[in-house]
Structure formats: C-alpha cells, structure tokens
Amino acid sequence: MITQIKTPRQKQRFLNACRGKLCLGATMPLAFALFGKSQPGRFFAGPTLALDVGGSTAWLAGHANPEELAGFLAFCGCEAVVLDEAECPPPTGWKRAKTHSVFGLAPGRQLPLPEADASLWQSLAKNTEPAAGKAADLLFPDRPSKRDDFYSELCSKRSRGLARVWTLEREGNIICTVGAYALANGQAYMACGETVEALRGKGVGGRLIVEMANALAAEGWMPVFLCSPERVHFYTRLGLEKMGEYVRYAAP
C-alpha cells in the first residue's frame, strides 16, 4: 500500500528504499529532509518503496505493485516516472520512453583535465560561490516559475552545506556553470552543466565538470551524474565510469 509519510515507520521505509541507490540515494532523502514538512503531499512510501511526486515526473526507489503504482501516479497527475527496471516493474500500461545512464567517479579517484580552448579558459575566472540568482537566470531564462523554484531550493541547500555551484565568469557574467545539487550519503549528485550557446564546443564546460568532480572525489564524495542518451558520449569522453541505468516511463 502506497501511503503518505506520517509515521516514523513510514519514514524509515522511505529511507530504506533509497539506501545505496545511485543518485536517488542522495537526492530523495535530501529532498525529504528539507521539504518533508513543508510539502507533505510530495513524499510517499510502501513496504519497499520510496516515491517523490514533487513534479510532473515522479522519482521511484525500490519496488511497487505495477497496477497500484499506475493508479496512484495517475491520481497524482504524474506524466512520467523514473525507476530502476532491475528492481521495479513499470506501472501497468505505461510506455518506456527513455533510458537515463548514471556516470560517476569513485571516491579518491582523479581524472585528467580534458582539453579546452586555452585562450578562452585563461580569460575566464572561476567562482566557487556564485550568486544563486545569476546561476538560476542562466539555467532557466524562459521559465520563471522553474527559475524561482531552483533559486529557493539552491539557497536552502547551500546554506546547509548540502549543495555547491561553480561558474566560469567574464566581467561578472556567467559563461559556464555546473553544480553538485545533493551532497548526501556519500554521493555528490552533479547536474545542470551549461555553457552559453556562443561558446559551446570549446571544452570549457567539460573541464569545469572534471575539476569539480575531482575536488569532490578528493574529499571522499562519489560524484554521480544522471544523463540522457544524447549525453552518454560526452560523459564517456570525460573519463567518467558508467555505473548503472534508470528508465523513464510515460503515462498512457
């Protein structure tokens, strides 16, 4: 039975289902710790299930009955769900849409810095404490509600030491950014790598990603990325290791 988390036992079920899961073992417990009280209708648990329905895409760790899951996700208005096919069968009637690959770097390991345009790289200043608002503006210029949510969540996490953002800047303008948006349970979930369109393809984004991953791994974190099929070659080229897969299913 999928139920809203209201008791210590239900909370423990949620955390147990997340434990040891790549990416989700960091993102879901951290989201619950920060927003479980203010967004009680977002987090649900079953005997072996953790479920976050905070947006149009649900995130699932563990296992659920396929028919019950399909009905529950439809009731919540979810358009998609991301799950581990090796552990959880898809919701009944839902269609396989996309495979997401997990790439990562073992704690303590270091990658060589990839090539980048030397003159461009030298012209940029690295900022390890950029303004959250400026990063949000770069990432979501045409989605004001998403930008505001991102800004609020980043501020909440960063003030607690649970997220980091790095940027490359020129004259105060962000040229490139990447962040670790969930530092929890030994994992550093990295995401939102973005370079301004005019300067893409020059290697600065990849080098910034590797620099941050190396720094986190040196501290004992395991940097992890969840990427779409079109980004697999990029992360492979950087030297990151493919560690697993999740699958996105779309509602009928």
Segments (PLM) and residue ranges:
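Conserved catalytic-core motifs of GNAT/GCN5-like acyltransferases
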Residues: 96-108, 241-252
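Short amphipathic alpha-helix that is part of the acyltransferase structural core
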Residues: 1-27, 99-103, 107-149
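A conserved beta-strand-loop-helix scaffold within acyl/acetyltransferase catalytic domains
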Residues: 146-194
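Conserved active-site alpha-helix within GNAT-family acetyltransferase domains
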Residues: 87-97, 206, 229-246
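Conserved GNAT acetyl-CoA-binding A-motif
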Residues: 76-86, 216-228
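N-terminal charged segments
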Residues: 1-93
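A conserved beta-turn-beta hairpin within the catalytic core of GNAT-like acetyltransferases
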Residues: 54-59, 182-190, 200
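Conserved acetyl-CoA-binding loop-helix of GNAT-fold acetyltransferases
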Residues: 65-72, 191, 195-197, 201-218, ...
